[in-house]
Amino acid sequence: MLKNETLRRDADAIIRASLNAVLPDEAVRRALKNFRPQGGRVLLVAAGKAAWQMAHAAVKFLGRVDGGVVVTKYGHVKGTIPGVDCCEAGHPVPDENGFAATRKALELVQGLTAEDTVLFLLSGGGSALFEKPLIPGAELQQITGQLLASGADIVEMNTIRKRLSGVKGGRFAQSCAPAQVFSIVLSDILGDPLDMIASGPAVPDTSTCAQALAIAEKYHLQLSAQAKALLAQETPKVLDRVATQITGSVRELCSAAANACRELGYEPVILTDRLCCEAREAGSFLGSIARTHAGQGNKLAFLAGGETVVHLTGTGLGGRNQELALAAAPVIAGLDAAVFSVGSDGTDGPTDAAGGYVDGSTAAALVQNQLKVYDVLQNNDAYHALKAVDGLIITGATGTNVNDVSVVLIGNQG
């Protein structure tokens, strides 16, 4: 079966339209309509993969700020912002540059008065990028690596990370007191739990130390005595003079993707905006939907937003969206159908790809390249397999981060 160029073009168009709809510029401007400074200084702190774009939009809207710090992922700073120190740091594992940038932010908010305002711009990735470790940095990096490899979901990971940090779980807002803190948040966690997005630096924490200890036991985390003691301590449950507004989420991403499908002649159905399971299981399931509905003579689209997980069993290269797509390839073999999945931030795992695309021809192409899907997935090497069959989705850094969207396209040929 020849590669389906029509489905690939449609997939690319849907990706562009959905990502454009959740870019932070307009979202930040919309949220700032509710921004009411107290009359004193206005200081800006932005953390996360979308931090630079959010800060750039905010300063453009406000005209100026009295100082600021941005900390974002390597390669995500796009230029200078007047009055703002723009820093890059490690993600998903925190590094010394992130620690240094966070120290700058904490120094910036020291000695504020009740007349001052901290504009805090937060997006996904902030848990790694915005960090003041309460344990040695090397140990925090090691614990983060354990969590990433364990298959723990983002809520479980952040419940642990809050207690090992001097800024997470509401502690950054405490550092800003008595100033007002106005937070604008791009949500990357299903259901938009404010205290879990980037580990909630400026909102009260709803998780408990009992939950943290249970998670550590569940995943058999190797912890020092100091780290164990911190997990047993509670985080701030009440904060004063803090306001928070969510301005982007996976629901908007799914809605935009569905609208793009409709404009291309597909009948779209949003299955869920809370997809949360093993990536390869999600891929097989979405592939089975294509197998069930193909051949009916209608152009159909099924969409799922959320964030899957990957249990590392090998030493290859890839990401959750690439694994999802690859797992669908054998299920849709021979069909006039495609499955693709993309991360809204433009990066999927430690790769330059945003996600992966497969269609009815991909399984045969993999065989021609002497690649077996099961073996590739066991080695977590979806990147190289998809690259061999032109199945990588490359967008570059988008400047936003509101989870992932996965799409099944079914052509009218069956």
What do the predicted segments below correspond to?
Residues 136-222:
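Internal gly/pro-rich beta-alpha loop/helix module
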Residues 326-414:
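Internal helix-turn-beta structural module
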Residues 265-341, 350:
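Active-site segments that bind and position negatively charged phosphate/pyrophosphate groups
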